[in-house]
Amino acid sequence: GHRLIASTVGFLTIIMAVWLWRAEPRRWLRWFGVATLGSVIAQGLLGGLTVLFFLPAVISTAHAGLAEIFFCMTVAIAIFTSPGWIAGYAPGTEPRPGLSGEPGPTLRLLATAATVLIYTQIIVGATMRHTGAGLAIPDFPLMFGHLIPDHWSSAIAIHFTHRVGALLVSGAILTVFAHVRSRYRDHRELMRPAALMVGLVVVQVTLGAMTVLSRRDPWTNSFHVLCGALVLTTSLIVTLRAWRGSIADRGLRIADSIEDSGADSRGSQLIHNPIRNPQSTIRNDRARA
């Protein structure tokens, strides 16, 4: 089942990369699609090595970490090709006094830090899972009946790091949500994923506790891994949308080769599709300015 799903994902990624290369006017995004295809190929190679070498911890952890990166890359492509990203997100209502317009550097910093922290936490969790440290601390919420373990080993240290990481991630997500709610609550494209992050992290912490208390029940453990991926990609969505203005200012949103689009079949398609036509977006942006 795992190999069949992996093959299907690889096939769909090939289709996506080819589609981007043929139809997407933004050169950087076409190459991003190629990089995404490269990541899924590398993921398949790591999967093969994992089997050949009988699940070594280092390769298995790298396999898990690259899977998260590939997932994030596909989500990023979905964001980059969405009408909201291309045309610009509009507040749900008229901005109210005291609220900000475009996301500023503080939100960008907070969201980026949260995303990096979540990914680091996932890597620590994968290390814990593949080194057999999942039950190194068998109780919850205490650790051997104490707030801090009264004895140590490498497995206990990894498990303890994962629990501390959960606290840090929860704090980072709550900080991002509080900042978005206080400054950008009229921006639905930020408020919705920020609020979803809070709900997901509550579920994730609950699943983590249940994983320990159930002695690593396979279903509970699997949903814990799944929810972690959802927390990561939801944070990534907030991060990308917070950085959108800066990315657009650097010209990455618009293909630097659009002037050559008339030389191939993409040109006529873009002219008749205002959402997919970056030149039209430029004119609209200038008109709004």
Model-based region annotation:
Residues 1-92, 99-248, 286-289:
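Polytopic transmembrane helical bundles with strong interfacial aromatic enrichment
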Residues 86-94, 100-102, 247-285:
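Short, basic, low-complexity termini and linkers enriched in Ser/Thr/Gly/Pro
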